[in-house]
Amino acid sequence: MAAASVSAASDSQFSSVLAEPSRSNGNMVRHSSSPYVLYPPDKPFLNSDLRRSPNKPTFAYPESNSRAIFSALKNLQDKIRRLELERIQAEESVKTLSRETIEYKKVLDEQIQERENSKNEESKHNQELASQLVAAENKCNLLEKQLEYMRNMIKHAEMERTSVLEKQVSLERERQHDQTHVQSQLEKLDLLEQEYNKLTAMQALAEKKMQELESKLREEEQERKRMQARAAELQSGLEANRLIFEDKTTSCVSTSTRKIKKKKSKPPEKKGSRTYFGAQPHYRLCLGDMPFVAGTSTSPSHAVVANVQHVLHLMKHHSKALCNDRVVNSVPLAKQACSRVSKSKKSVVPPSSSVNEELSDVLQTLQDEFGQMSFDHQQLTKLIQESPTVELKDNLECELEALVGRMEAKANQITKVRKYQAQLEKQNIDKQKKELKANKKTLDEEGNSSGRSSGVPRTASKKDLAKQRPGEKSRKNLQLLKDMQTIQNSLQSSNLCWDY
């Protein structure tokens, strides 16, 4: 307000100042005399009908500087007044606007509060409705669950009823099947009992026969021991006779060295008239040449008792096959030694052949057992396929597994015996080659020595050969015994079951 009063006072003073020169100018215009006609102040353009207000006259001639300044100041004063009026109007409008804004704010606040109140009420109402809806949904879910539970109960009851009916039907069928199965099993049991009775009778007969055979074996062992004792006595007598004969032959050789020329002129039949063995009695047999019996047979038969009986029969009936060559043969020792040296190739074969025969017999028995096991395996598989119950099938499967294990063990035994047989064949071939080489060397050495030396050392070398030959068969029999022991050890080392 103070600013407005100050501006009004300044405007009044400025207007009074401007009014005074305007008055003076008017007086000057009026009193001045000019030849020009005055320009109409209300018509700015001559050729147009445009008119101006008398408050703003136009002058046709140029004004002076002071007058121009006064007009400019007047124009400025008018502009200032207009601006003041506009400012006042603007202030009033601002005041009205501020009032209106305050009122509008109040109205807006009231409306906002009303809206918030209405929203709160609506939210509360909506929450109540939502809670009611949730409760209704929960009730619906509970009802649905109850319905599903009731349906499940009904289905379960129906399933139980059907299962009970099916069980009853299956039990009836099983009863009928069990009755038929029991009847078949009873029939099988009757057959098995009959077979068992037959087997027990056969076993009793076999036991009786075994007892009789054992008694016979004991008697035969006693007889064999007696024969061995008697043979030992005879062997000792034979050795004494041999020593006496060797003494006689040495004396004959010493006399023959003195009369070499006479002996050369005489026929060769008379030279060895005293060195011959006569037809000696047959009881002079060599026990080292007898076949060795070690629990298994050397002949094609598998019965040990039969083999022992055969040997004793040969001994009783004076078989020349079991006697020493020096006792039975009428050929001199020198000729026997030469013949034995020449036939050394053939003497190697019998023990190896006997071992091979025994191994082939063992292989045959093992293969027979394996074939029987394979037949049992087929029968068990058929029974497993035809078994009606699960328990019987399990028992049969257990038996089949045990049978498979035994078959594997039997196959291992067969492979071991075959390997050992191949090794023996290789060893026999190597031995034959070595003995052939040794015999060739000995024959060459004897030929060289016979070409260089006289007849006396030749007879001595033949005597040495004759001394070496009698124990050769016993050594071969010992080698056969060792081979059999190695076979037994190789078969027993795996701790396998032989019978099934």
Curated annotation (Swiss-Prot):
One BP term from GO: fibroblast growth factor receptor signaling pathway
Modified residues (Phosphoserine): S53
Residue runs in coiled coils: 63-242, 389-449
Assigned keywords, A-Z: Coiled coil, Cytoplasm, Cytoskeleton, Microtubule, Nucleus, Phosphoprotein
Cellular localisation: Nucleus; Cytoplasm; Cytoplasm, Cytoskeleton, Microtubule organizing center, Centrosome
Superkingdom as given in the UniProt entry: Eukaryota
Recorded GO CC terms: centriolar satellite; centrosome; cytoplasm; cytosol; Golgi apparatus; microtubule; nucleus
Annotated region described as Mediates interaction with microtubules, given as residue ranges: 278-491
InterPro entries: Centrosomal_MT-associated, Cep57_CLD, Cep57_MT-bd_dom
Identification of the protein by name: Centrosomal protein of 57 kDa
Organism of origin: Mus musculus
Gene this chain is encoded by: Cep57
